[in-house]
């Protein structure tokens, strides 16, 4: 009986030291999103709520991101931001993230405070490596 304890303990230590398996991204939801970007094995899909972004009105954005091309793995982290490149400034508010599942988050508190050309920025992280995807959006009064 005493011989089993060290073997069991060794097995537990080996399992604990092994790297965690990465999660697959929710590809079933990825295809259902109205807007998508893909570049070099990284894909991002999203939808806003409300669907039409109004000037100076809060909205949320649900984002799904996948990395590693054919393997379709969930990234370690996603962030969303927006700015007006022609004006050299971003939003006046910082959105808050709510993680729904691996590779799937909602960002609340997005506000485009003035009309014009905005650039949505999606930063998708695989460990410390960041892949940035952008989409231009025009908001009118």
Regions flagged by a language model, labelled:
Residues 1-9:
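Bacterial N-terminal signal peptides that target proteins for export
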Residues 17-19:
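N-terminal signal peptide c-region/cleavage motif recognized by signal peptidases
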Residues 22-119, 123-141:
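Contiguous segments within soluble domain cores/interaction surfaces
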């Amino acid at each position: 009986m005493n011989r089993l304890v060290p073997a069991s303990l060794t097995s537990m230590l080996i399992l604990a030291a092994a790297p965690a398996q990465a999660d697959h991204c929710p590809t079933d939801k990825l295809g259902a999103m109205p807007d998508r970007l893909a570049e070099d094995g990284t894909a991002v899909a999203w939808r806003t709520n409300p669907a039409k972004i109004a000037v100076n009105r809060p909205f949320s954005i649900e984002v799904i991101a996948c990395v590693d091309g054919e393997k379709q793995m969930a990234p370690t982290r996603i962030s969303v931001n927006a700015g007006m490149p022609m004006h050299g400034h971003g939003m006046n508010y910082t959105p808050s993230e709510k993680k729904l599942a691996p590779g799937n988050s909602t960002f609340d508190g997005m506000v485009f405070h003035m009309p014009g050309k905005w650039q949505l920025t999606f930063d998708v992280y695989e460990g410390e490596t960041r892949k940035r995807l952008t989409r231009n959006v025009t908001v009118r009064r």
